Amino acid sequence: MLAIALLRICGVVLFILALTLAGVGWVARGPLVLRASSFTGRPSSSTWPSISVQNLRATVKTLCEDLSPRSYHPPSNLARVADWIAGRLRETGLVVMEQDYRTSEGTYRNVIALRQGTDRQRGVTVIGAHYDTCGPFPGADDNASGVAVLLELVRTLPKPPPRSSQFFVAFGTEEDPFFGSQDMGSAHFARKLSDDGTRVELMIALDLVGFFSDEPGSQSFPYGFLQLYYPGRGDFIAVVGDLGAGRWIRRVKRGMLAAKALPVYSFRGPSLIPGIDWSDHFSFRQLGLPGVLVTDTAFLRNAHYHQPTDTPGTLDYSRMAAVVQALHGVLAEEGT
């Protein structure tokens, strides 16, 4: 037993050493860990007058209060939420579709808005956020924030159609007991795209995008050495992916930084690091499709994660508006 324990300890030490060396090497070449934010300072909603802080706040409040609970049992909980999201998306004038799927726990639904591109030969971009919660918790940051950003992004899309088609998806089941299984809502949607022969150019999962802090030391890290590369304040948004996601991380980060909305940092690492694949991009990566996560880093910053204190009053809606603006920057690059 002692020998096994020592082997495990040695393995962890070697992994951290390898990751450290990889991080130092990659800083010179590209973003494994990269201090590459060209924007500093607190965002102001006046920078993008069409994006409404009030809408973001109202959406989170509705999801956390009027439509609570958003837990998977019984399925009628999430059916009410899906109906409401579908109604909001239809108000934008986009084509709205609903994908019902069966699981061992019941039938659930993905809600999909399609912004049709002018060039049908090009691949599609997918931006999605799950609308269920972990147990009975309010789930303001996880993940009413992601749904609110998704809906506000769709509401403020420019009128001219893009060259590449874009899907905006509210996923029905992401939390336990579905997480990591074939019954995640995103897994059902990814398989449908794959079965239809639809080429996915990029998938972005929005998960926990509303908690920010200017307090020193408010940002923590899975490994201490990462403090060498990242700020100690939780005032930035992160683009995260696995070791094979480097080119997609760079594309998303480039578009977000071009919007000059808020600081953007990126991280690329092995999936055994906690949080790397903890969202709907996981389903796409399982099929070999592009997928990255846009996040406030969840439990590494937000002490309310998966707690009853994850309430609307803890979120920063001005910075959520900045995330919407940053995503417009990504779509501008992807759609051209």
Go through the PLM ranges and name each one.
Residues 53-66, 88, 92, 104-171:
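Catalytic-core environment of secreted peptidases
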Residues 40-51, 67-76, 97-101, 133-143, ...:
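Second-shell loop/turn segments in exported
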Residues 134-250, 273-276:
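Acidic/histidine-rich catalytic neighborhood of metal-dependent amide-processing enzymes
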Residues 8-26:
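Hydrophobic membrane-insertion alpha-helices, especially the h-region
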Residues 202, 214-336:
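Active-site-adjacent substrate-binding region
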